[in-house]
Regions:
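Helix-loop-helix connectors at the membrane interface of multi-pass transporters/channels
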Residues: 1, 77, 83, 104-127, ...
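Membrane-interface "cap" regions at the ends of multi-pass membrane proteins
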Residues: 1-31, 36-40, 46, 52-60, ...
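TM-loop-TM module centered on a large, flexible mid-protein loop between adjacent transmembrane helices
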Residues: 74-75, 112-118, 184, 195, ...
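C-terminal membrane-solvent junction of multi-pass transporters and transport-like membrane proteins
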Residues: 186, 313-324, 360-408, 429-438
Length: 438
């Protein structure tokens, strides 16, 4: 069986997770959610963070005794069998590709702005298609090189968010005017929950650490720790940013801004360098998300190919110790989707939300099942308050599914149907023998 090289330590793995979590969401969604929840967007971040933490804890336990690449695909396969595992892997792989395609367009918009290039559709598509290919080439050099670049980008965007919190917070508390926090619930508690349903998707990405478990040293110890470290850092940054943002700028104004962090910080400082660095951090954020998506998407496909639920040719490992074929496919697919859709990804992006909830549902359900079928497996981490934690994780996914648009549900199930046809064709061709029931 082809194996990947273990090159990542604890902080390298955590960096991959932080890179996948902190994307353009915090730079844009803070405004959208503030317009819905008002100052209670702070509560929205807490609700969304706690909801995502349920799945994060389940991921941490599963990764402590299942150390193969594949993450949610491997967990679901071991818990429920090959077909449910394929559905989860199919959705998650496409999530990586579609999510990165949307982020690539975001990168192109920021890049053309800073480069002083007119942001015509053709220019955005060209830049958005080319950038994933450049990052793909970097990934082909090896995980160590890709992780090193990612860690630099992660450090820069963390520095930008910390700078925002410090500068904005200092101004806010020295001024002593907290009127923007009142009324705290202008849309009621329902507004806070509606805001949380949007913000929730800014917390996903920690599962990428589990997907690359096979490339982490001492994965049974380092992967669960990396998941929790990444989650804790991102949650603290998100809550800090939300507290400062709504304190500096009226929530209604914040909700109408296309660049809410920059708009809020202009209240606290007119320093050109600080404002430009905060704005530039969107370039760091988008690049690290694309980088992490290529890493995660390629490893998810690799894990499926190694078990031959997709053609085994995609399980090839290069001399650099990386899944060469699936890195190529993932990078090219990201660029191709941007190009073929002419940058119009709204209808495809709906699959992302659907696929995320499917994946999180099965992560929590897999923990419940594997506690029953593999009770003696050595676990370096155990979910607290079991079984309530994974049960609440399952329930939260079902609850959030009611907030999905009809388009997301139709397109999502349509993509599952396409996957099932592909699965049946590949199984017939490869003649995979039936497996025993789990």
């Amino acid at each position: 069986m082809a194996e990947l090289k273990r090159t990542l330590g604890l902080w390298g793995a955590a960096g991959i997770g932080i890179g996948a979590i902190i994307g353009t969401g915090i730079f844009v969604l803070i405004g959208v959610a503030s317009g819905i929840a008002g100052p209670a967007v702070i509560v929205s971040f807490l609700i969304a963070g706690l909801t995502a933490l349920l799945t994060g804890l389940s991921t941490a336990e599963l990764s402590s005794f299942i150390t193969e690449s594949g993450g949610s695909y491997i967990y679901t396969t071991k818990a429920f069998g090959r077909l449910p595992g394929f559905v989860v892997g199919w959705m998650k792989s496409f999530d990586y590709i579609v999510g990165a395609s949307a982020v690539s367009i975001g990168f192109a918009a920021y890049f053309t702005y800073f480069a002083g290039i007119p942001s015509a559709v053709g220019t955005l598509v060209l830049v958005g298609s080319a950038w994933p290919l450049i990052l793909m080439v970097l990934n082909l050099r090896g995980m160590k090189e890709a992780s090193g670049t990612n860690n630099v980008l992660v450090a820069l965007k963390i520095a930008a968010l910390v700078l925002f919190i410090l500068v904005g917070g200092f101004y806010l508390f020295t001024r002593g005017d907290f009127s923007n926090y009142h009324p705290f619930f202008p849309r009621g508690i329902s507004g806070a929950f509606s805001g949380a349903s949007i913000i929730f998707f800014a917390f996903i990405g920690f599962n990428t650490i589990a997907v690359i478990a096979e490339e982490v040293k001492e994965p049974e110890k380092n992967v669960p720790r990396a998941v929790l470290i990444a989650f804790a850092i991102c949650t603290l940054l998100y809550i800090g940013v939300s507290v400062v943002s709504v304190g500096l700028l009226n929530w209604q104004v914040l909700g109408l801004s296309s660049a809410p962090l920059e708009a809020a910080l202009r209240v606290a400082t007119g320093n050109f360098l600080i404002l430009e660095f905060i704005a530039l951090s969107a370039l760091f954020a988008t690049t690290s998300v694309i980088m992490s998506s290529i890493i995660g998407g390629s490893r998810a496909l690799f894990a499926m190919a190694r078990q031959r639920v997709i053609p085994g040719v995609f399980a090839h490992v290069s001399r650099a110790g990386i899944p060469f074929a699936t890195v190529l496919i993932t990078g090219i697919a990201i660029g191709a989707i941007v190009f073929l859709t002419n940058g119009n990804l709204d209808w495809l992006a709906s699959i992302f939300n659907f696929g995320t909830l499917v994946t999180f549902f099965f992560i929590n359900a897999s923990l419940l099942q594997l506690r029953r079928t593999m009770p003696d497996a050595p676990r370096r981490f155990r979910v607290p308050l079991y079984p309530f934690t994974p049960v609440l994780g399952v329930a939260s996914c079902l609850f959030l599914s009611f907030y999905l648009s009809p388009n997301a549900i139709v397109v999502g199930f349509g993509w599952v149907a396409i996957g099932l046809v592909a699965y049946a064709v590949n199984r017939r061709r490869s003649r995979v023998p039936p497996e025993p029931a789990p």
